UniProtKB/Swiss-Prot annotation:
Residues 202-239, 373-402 are annotated as: Disordered. The keyword Hydrolase applies. It comes from Streptomyces pristinaespiralis. InterPro entries: Cas12f1-like_TNB, RNA-guided_DNA_endo/Transpos, Transposase, Transposase_put_HTH. Its EC number is 3.1.21.-. GO terms for molecular function: DNA binding; endonuclease activity; metal ion binding. This is Putative RNA-guided DNA endonuclease. An RNA-guided dsDNA endonuclease. When guided by an RNA derived from the right-end element of its insertion sequence element (IS), cleaves DNA downstream of the transposon-associated motif (TAM). Cleaves supercoiled and linear DNA in a staggered manner 15-21 bases from the TAM yielding 5'-overhangs. Binds reRNA, an approximately 150 nucleotide base sRNA derived from the 3' end of its own gene, the right end (RE) of the insertion sequence (IS) plus sequence downstream of the IS. In the N-terminal section; belongs to the transposase 2 family. It comes from the Bacteria. The active site is at 188, 272, 353. The lineage of its organism: Bacteria, Bacillati, Actinomycetota, Actinomycetes, Kitasatosporales. The keyword Zinc applies. NCBIfam families: guided_TnpB, IS200/IS605 family accessory protein TnpB-like domain. GO terms for biological process: DNA recombination; transposition.
Length: 402
């Protein structure tokens, strides 16, 4: 059955000098309003144990605009400023619900520069987008068309560290489920092989960062040789950002193609609930694990399975997938990472990764059949339940990566 989802379509655009200046001012004002509101909420929370609502923050913004030193806030569109306060409200709601850490201040150099416009702050006419406080429509490079008849409800403009400008259009889209199939696959994440499938196929890790490591190192050396605060250092930093952007784009493209293929070919996809944050504490493997981007792959699998009528099952991270003999069910005592093949007492010879993928699939199918839980829990291994089923949230709960 077809379903309606909110989907973001991201495009690159090239602003005029006037548009770039206006948007840069807007980015600065958005960052200032966010940080001042966060400062006020922090004083209220840590000083008085008092929570500040969005309405109170919005009233404070009105007062700021009346002061002489912050009168320039009235020169940009008010909608991005209000949206910044809404995002801060969401950040605090997640903090109080213990879903995230305490909100952090936005940095001019490190944070992504962005501004969000709702329907009242932009004009969409004949496929052209004009933002508030700008006279001309944006010069957007339409790399793919919007859904037929779709109109954006929210527009987010951003600029990355490499100096590239992007616009993201949030639209309603109709998703048709993929044709049903009986195939199922278990996925074991790795470093040498990015993923190993229960079919025995190994997807080689492209190692995107390593391909540009020499270029990145040279660009970083150039930065270190420039005087701090100089224009040349700023140019050198932008070159570093361009290399990072190249790596990120290449990685994202590969993961999208891989996740789409896995979802299209299989009715059930089973993965492990890996805690990447803890794995990154391994100094020798941290760079390789970060480059593999397992979390990003999982995120793509989650929303694509939800879109196309597939089932995603996540088994417990403590399930001994590599040490469990898929033939007799015996669990081996120790299995160091350097051991890629091992022989069970029953005589079965196992490839470490293929055996793990097959055990993951078997555990996932068992969890799917019995409906064992909703979300992975660390305690499940102590209570004898080695795997659980996870129902991914619908894409309408947030904007997926595209």
């Amino acid at each position: 059955m077809m379903q309606q989802v909110k989907r973001a379509f991201k495009y690159r655009f090239y602003p005029t000098d006037e548009q770039a200046a206006e948007l840069s001012r807007t980015f600065g004002c958005v960052r200032l309003v966010y940080n001042k509101a966060l400062e006020g909420r922090t004083r209220a929370w840590y000083g008085e144990q008092r929570r500040v609502s969005y309405v109170q923050s919005s009233a404070a913004l009105t007062e700021w605009k009346k002061t002489e030193e912050l009168a320039f806030l009235s020169e940009v569109s008010s909608v991005p400023l209000q949206q910044a306060l809404r995002h801060l409200q969401t950040a605090f709601a997640n903090f109080f619900a213990k879903r995230s850490k305490y909100p952090r201040y936005k940095s001019r150099k490190k944070s992504r520069a962005s501004a969000e416009y709702t329907r009242s702050a932009f004009t969409w006419r004949n496929g052209q987008l004009t933002l508030a406080k700008t006279a001309e429509p944006l010069d957007i490079r339409w790399s793919r068309p919007l859904p037929e008849g779709a109109e954006p409800t929210t527009v987010t403009v951003s600029r990355d560290r490499a100096g590239r400008w992007f616009v993201s259009l949030l639209c309603e889209d109709t998703i048709t489920p993929a044709p049903a199939t009986t195939a199922a696959v278990g996925i074991d994440a790795g470093i040498t092989s990015l993923v190993t499938l229960s079919t025995g196929e190994k997807i080689t890790n492209p190692k995107h960062e390593r391909r540009d490591r020499a270029r990145l190192a040279k660009a970083q050396r150039d930065v270190s040789r420039k005087a701090k605060g100089s224009a040349n250092r700023k140019k050198a930093r932008r070159k570093v950002a361009r290399v990072h952007a190249r790596i990120t784009d290449r990685r994202c493209d590969f993961l999208h193609k891989l996740s789409t293929r896995l979802v299209r070919e299989n009715q059930t996809v089973v993965i492990e609930d890996l805690t990447v944050r803890n794995l990154l504490k391994n100094g020798k493997l941290a760079r390789a694990i970060s480059d593999a981007a397992w979390t990003e792959l999982r995120s793509m699998l989650e929303y694509k399975c939800a879109w196309y009528g597939r089932e995603l099952v996540v088994i417990d991270r403590w399930f001994p997938s590599s040490k469990l003999c898929g033939t007799c069910g015996t669990v081996r005592g120790k299995l160091p990472l350097n051991v890629r093949e091992w022989t069970c007492d029953c005589g079965a010879v196992h490839d470490r990764d293929v055996n793990a993928a097959r055990n993951i699939l078997a555990a996932g199918l068992a969890a799917s059949a019995c409906g064992d839980g909703i979300r992975p829990q660390r305690e499940s291994s102590r209570t004898g339940r080695s795997s659980v089923k996870q129902e991914p949230q619908r894409a309408t709960a947030g904007i997926p990566r595209l």
